[in-house]
Amino acid sequence: MNLRAIAVTFATFAGANAAVIDHDQVIPFAQPMPNTTLQSVAIQFKPQIYINNGCHPYPAVDADGNTSGGLKPTGSQSAGCKGSGYGSQIYGRAVEYEGVYAFMYSWYMPKDETLDGQGHRHDWENCVVWLDSLDRPSIVALSASYHSTYNYYYPPSSSYLDGNSAKIQYSTSWIVLDHSLSATSTAGEIQDLIMWDQLTDAARTALEDTDFGSANVPFKEDNFIAKLAKAYYV
């Protein structure tokens, strides 16, 4: 059996034994050393997130492919989800798109609640940082997920940037609307970054296959390019 076959067999076995576990028991990936230019640039431009209201980000999947069971929307908007004791996670995926470079950064929250009992289990949000090159990159635009579309910042105000780090806000201001992202002048928190190609096979498979209910993993194969098309700022 060759190495690829062994890897596939192991990933299949690991995925078959993965489970849905409590949201506060998912252990995040430590941010690895970059091995590619895309990985290096992704770290350089990693955004920060300010939680205006609602849950703080949590890891969605661990190295063995176990995924978060999320939280039922009860109590306050941040009840039970003010931060994981194991640390949190930001997920990344990057590609050249329409002559520029799209770096999608995604966060997972265990629930999306507006009022007690109103909302849904699980939330995925993302922003796209658009760069002009990889050699001497600079930010051309920002896109922040807003329900089924995006908020666009082209070019972004300097107040929305902390050096190379975009400042992103997670909030809702309407009882009937779920949480979404926008640019902000307020500094936020950062998490360890794990890129799509740095995840274990078991973790990638879990993110591809797990049903997160009303929330969709934006960077998985079926969604990534379609999301970039919506996020594109031109």
From Swiss-Prot:
Which GO CC terms are listed, alphabetically? extracellular region
Q: Give the location in the cell.
A: Secreted
Major site of localization recorded for this protein = secreted
Q: Is the keyword Amino-acid biosynthesis in the record?
A: no
Keywords for the protein's UniProt record, in alphabetical order? Glycoprotein, Secreted, Signal, Virulence
A Pfam family name for this chain? NPP1
Cleaved signal peptide residues: 1-18
- Domain of life per record: Eukaryota
Q: Where is this motif: Hepta-peptide GHRHDWE motif?
A: 119-125
Determine if Phosphoprotein is one of this entry's keywords: no
Tell me the protein family, please. Belongs to the Necrosis inducing protein (NPP1) family.
What is written about domains in the entry's comments?
A: Key residues/motif important for the effector activities are degenerated in most NLPs, including the nlp24 peptide consisting of the conserved region I (11-aa immunogenic part) and conserved region II (the heptapeptide GHRHDWE motif) that is important for phytotoxic activity.
What is the role of the protein in this entry? Secreted effector that contributes strongly to virulence during infection by P.capsici.
Identification of the protein by name: NLP effector protein Pc576423
The scientific name of the source species is Phytophthora capsici
